[in-house]
Amino acid sequence: MYSENPIKRRASTRIYVGDVPIGDGAPIAVQSMTNTLTTDVDATVAQIRALENVGADIVRVSVPTMDAAEAFKLIKQQSNIPLIADIHFDYRIALKVAEYGVDCLRINPGNIGNEERIRSVVECARDKNIPIRIGINGGSLEKDLMDKYKEPTPEALLESAMRHVDILDRLNFDQFKVSVKASDVFLAVEAYRLLAKQIVQPLHLGITEAGGARSGSVKSAVGLGMLLAEGIGDTLRVSLAADPVEEIKVGFDILKSLRIRSRGINFIACPSCSRQEFDVISTVNELERRLEDIVTPMDVSIIGCVVNGPGEALVSDIGLTGGARKSGYFDDGVRQKERFDNDNIVDSLEAKIRAKASIINGRIPAQDINK
């Protein structure tokens, strides 16, 4: 597979969220946010584990009350991946979750009280080596900025972000990342472009309130893809009105499409037409379902006829080209003598893909796959 990647990442400082490096060339981290009641510890822990199982690097948890902070303590004790506490208005909640081992605080320094309260949170974060995310959102800009700009604009988002950055700068705190999210793609993209020129800290990307699973995925892919292709972004969240697990899957698919970071199988499949020799759509859907557990990066082409099939197979780890009654099978671009019965394609291909993943991971000798 042609894999030249012309993207030059924006230079930034590095912070750590738990043991996950962010910025300075580190792999772009994919995160999501729980949508359970935080006080429902069992449900929240279960969702965090589900997110971990599909590859989430970091999970954010809303902590709106002191009761939620006490629940967070229990949640943190049962979680294996770094957790960010999302906090607004009450600085005491930030101090409390810091005691309980939070890995990052998502706050806006300007909305948690006066300078003394801000200082107490920042000093606590410094003492406990906890980074902060400044999270600016087009839907919650300060009143004076709305009066000045009349509506959310890239310049308004930038000005809001720089206010909060300046607060941390005055307190000599540099362990932070920043986001300037908006629900409009062009608004968010331009705000991030402006911010990327102003600061050296890592940037967390997101198109906020993007929509449902389909429309939100498309909007996020367009917006985040534009920024990532320009080298902007160190961590991301795809915000969907859907199961948070889908956010992680879409996030990795975006990174995979740009060949920035790969996890699991990259399926190359034709949309099918009357030339197809087997049911391509049902085959791909079933294989995606069966092979969700595979994290090994690999390219698998599934093409229903010989027009494009051999060409795609030549640049795939595993390739399938439709043929009458039996379909051709390629391994590392080499056509194999073995052919698959079209009535048993899914089972046959699943076995080959799993064997290939084991070879790539070094668990079985290469010659064993085609015996």
UniProtKB/Swiss-Prot annotation:
Pathway: Isoprenoid biosynthesis; isopentenyl diphosphate biosynthesis via DXP pathway; isopentenyl diphosphate from 1-deoxy-D-xylulose 5-phosphate: step 5/6
Single GO molecular function: 4-hydroxy-3-methylbut-2-enyl-diphosphate synthase activity (flavodoxin)
SUPFAM superfamilies: Dihydropteroate synthetase-like, Nitrite and sulphite reductase 4Fe-4S domain-like
Statement: the UniProt record of this protein carries the keyword 4Fe-4S: yes
Known EC number: 1.17.7.3
The keyword Iron-sulfur belongs to this UniProt entry's keyword annotation: yes
Catalytic activity: (2E)-4-hydroxy-3-methylbut-2-enyl diphosphate + oxidized [flavodoxin] + H2O + 2 H(+) = 2-C-methyl-D-erythritol 2,4-cyclic diphosphate + reduced [flavodoxin]
GO aspect biological process, one term: isopentenyl diphosphate biosynthetic process, methylerythritol 4-phosphate pathway
Cofactor details (free text): Binds 1 [4Fe-4S] cluster.
Binding-site residues for [4Fe-4S] cluster, renumbered to this chain: C270, C273, C305, E312
Essential cofactor(s): [4Fe-4S] cluster
InterPro entries listed in its UniProt record: Dihydropteroate_synth-like_sf, IspG_bac, IspG_bac-typ, NO2/SO3_Rdtase_4Fe4S_sf
Protein keywords: 4Fe-4S, Iron, Iron-sulfur, Isoprene biosynthesis, Metal-binding, Oxidoreductase
Pfam families: GcpE
Task performed by this protein: Converts 2C-methyl-D-erythritol 2,4-cyclodiphosphate (ME-2,4cPP) into 1-hydroxy-2-methyl-2-(E)-butenyl 4-diphosphate.
Similarity section: Belongs to the IspG family.
Database matches in HAMAP family: IspG (MF_00159)
Protein name as catalogued: 4-hydroxy-3-methylbut-2-en-1-yl diphosphate synthase (flavodoxin)
Organism (species): Shewanella sediminis (strain HAW-EB3)
